[in-house]
Amino acid sequence: MVVVIEMSAKPRLDRGRAGNGLALLAALGVGATLAGCGSSAEVTPAGSAAPQSPVAQPSPAPYDISRIGAVVDDFPQDFTAQAHPAKTLGQSDIDGSAVAAFTNAVVDPPQCRSVVIPPYVDPKVGTEAAGVIGQGDQGNMYVVALRSPEPIAPAPDPAGCDRISLSGSPEASGSVERVAAPAIAGVTTTGVKLSVADPEADPDYLYTAALDDRTSVVVMGSAAEELDPQRLMSDLLVKSVSAIQGQQQP
């Protein structure tokens, strides 16, 4: 979501109904090819001394985002869920993931883009991603764990963003409103509901969690009303964070 996953057709977030989905969901959940994570090291220029820390503290072990696959059994009973191993994203992955359509959308108020896609879940070249895709007659849901190549600290949401509109392209048009995100100790969480004008289309939900300044989780998609999609995806976020926190790489 070292194996390259190519999808010949993107699953429809509206489960085949007429109507436009919001490109955000495709941007993060579908169409991206997810390979091992490389690491980089800073090089000290010749002739200069590396700065010395008063006390050397070992860095905490990075979270193993491949553990996101543990939630494959937490989807509704009639969903078919498939885990996709971790892969490092290149520019072609991001260009092919429909993120460009969302990036070019008009966000009103303009300062509210970070409410819809917090910076820590906005994929960049070098981001490592792993995920689970769950599909069924009653919906499509995507769970993606991300590890950024550089630290991205969560920032407070801007004011005046309780309701947001997206426009500018058929793939990225609709309204966005904040919804309650689950409280997880030591973790920053967000939640939004995304709606399009088509009354036949179910709303989409997007929940995010920042475990630290490099590791994050996104749960997104839509489901039939009888499944209580807001509760369902909120619970999936909690379970996803728990799965990743359960064991760290040595």
Predicted feature residues:
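A small/polar (G/S/T-enriched), proline-flanked helix-loop surface module common
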Residues: 72, 79-205, 230
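Surface-exposed amphipathic alpha-helical segments
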Residues: 221-250
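Short, solvent-exposed coil/turn segments at beta-strand boundaries
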Residues: 185-188, 209-216
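Post-signal peptide N-terminal segment of mature Sec-exported envelope proteins
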Residues: 46-71
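C-terminal motif of bacterial Sec signal peptides marking the signal peptidase cleavage site
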Residues: 33-36
